[in-house]
Design a protein with these regions (language model features):
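C-terminal motif of bacterial Sec signal peptides marking the signal peptidase cleavage site
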Residues: 19-22
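A residue-level marker of the well-folded mature domains of exported/periplasmic proteins
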Residues: 3, 24-360
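Bacterial N-terminal signal peptides that target proteins for export
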Residues: 1-11
Length: 360
């Protein structure tokens, strides 16, 4: 009897530990799935996500496919992460349709999903709790404003007999952020042209990739062409091929400006112009505006080969994605966060409020 009593006394602490362990809060795990790793932009997003994870004491993983053309590898990453029973997921989807099954599973399992960067457009209702992203449409509009101001004399002087072309160069026609930028640049440029009093929509035509041509987009004008170009794939070599094709017809089509809507298309132009050094010599007077940052783009802007660029705040995008995920896990109300965008050029890129946004 004493032996059983002694055994019982020994079991009590063990049972108590088991009860306490079962009552311990589940460790918060948030996988952060980006669109790729081919651009330094994503490394800066990662740094922001890791900072938020440290602040809240949560575990995250940060992963993405090799390039932004690799849709299926990203789908598999999401499948694998959902099998680990995450507390929430932060996702920048390459293709919402490709992850529709996983989004519906997340709804059933009550796993909050936070979109970031391009987010998860057209997701099922209730799947996405909030999104941390730049307002890409408005950001590209800033680029159009600066390009118009720089080229105003050439644009207002354009006629059917002496037309001009402005290229709207986009990495793909599927990503929400990229397509929003392409459309934002297109629309703001049209608005500025119509406001100059010299031209109407009847003088403008938008050509190129059909994803960027809306039913109300002017397509028949002969004085000013906005040419929307998209490479065969988002991979860097294809962006370079497309960039070279654009540059080959600068003289024939009287291309006076090129807007590159992300780091990928910027790389294409830089690869085709010896990091921009050939621009002033071979294409004098042509304005080039970029997007985001990166060592080579920054150098091209500092040297005035590029007019300037639009910078996002990739660190804040990553931080806010994890911040929103944590708050959603805790049952707090969350809402979309506009992480901001700013214009910079050789005269402003060293200002503290700009310099902190410009990654290498």
């Amino acid at each position: 009897m004493k032996r059983f009593r002694r055994l019982g006394l020994l079991l009590i602490p063990a049972l108590a530990l088991m009860v306490l362990a079962s009552c311990a809060p589940k460790k918060i795990y948030i996988p952060v799935i980006s669109k790729g790793f081919q651009h330094q932009f994503w490394q800066t997003v990662k740094a922001g996500a890791e900072a938020a994870a440290k602040q809240y004491g949560v575990t995250i993983t940060f992963e993405g496919p090799p390039t932004e053309a690799d849709i299926q590898p990203q789908v598999q990453m999401l499948v694998n992460d959902m099998a680990k029973n995450p507390s929430a997921i932060a996702l920048a989807a390459l293709d919402t349709n490709a992850v529709m099954d996983q989004l519906n599973q997340a709804i059933k399992r009550k796993i909050p999903i936070i979109g970031f960067d391009s987010g998860v457009p057209n997701a099922p209702a209730g799947a996405i709790y909030a999104t941390a992203a730049t307002n890409s449409y408005n950001a590209a509009g800033i680029a159009a404003d600066h390009m118009y101001d720089a080229l105003k004399d050439k644009i207002t002087a354009a006629t059917a007999a002496h037309p001009v072309t402005i290229v709207d160069f986009n990495q793909d026609a599927t990503s929400q952020s990229v397509t929003d930028r392409g459309k934002g640049f297109r629309d703001e440029m049209i608005k500025k042209i119509e406001a100059d009093g010299k031209h109407t929509a009847d003088d403008i035509r938008v050509i190129g990739n059909p994803a960027f041509i809306a039913p109300d987009t002017p397509t028949k004008g002969k004085a000013i062409t906005i040419d929307v170009q998209v490479p065969a794939t988002p991979k860097d070599p294809d962006s370079a091929v497309s960039a070279q094709a654009i540059l080959n017809r600068v003289k024939k089509d009287n291309i006076i400006g090129i807007f590159c809507s992300n780091e990928g298309t910027v790389k294409g132009i830089l690869a085709s112009t010896a990091d921009g050094t050939a621009l002033p010599k071979n294409y004098p007077g042509m304005a080039v505006i970029g997007f985001d940052a990166g060592k080579n783009q920054k150098a091209a802007i500092r040297a005035k080969y590029f007019m300037g660029a639009i910078t996002q705040d990739p660190y804040n995008i990553g931080f806010q994605a994890v911040d929103l995920a944590y708050k959603a896990i805790k049952g707090q109300s969350v809402a979309n966060v506009d992480t901001g965008a700013k214009w910079y050029d050789s005269t402003t890129m060293d200002q503290p409020d700009i310099a902190r946004l410009l990654y290498d």
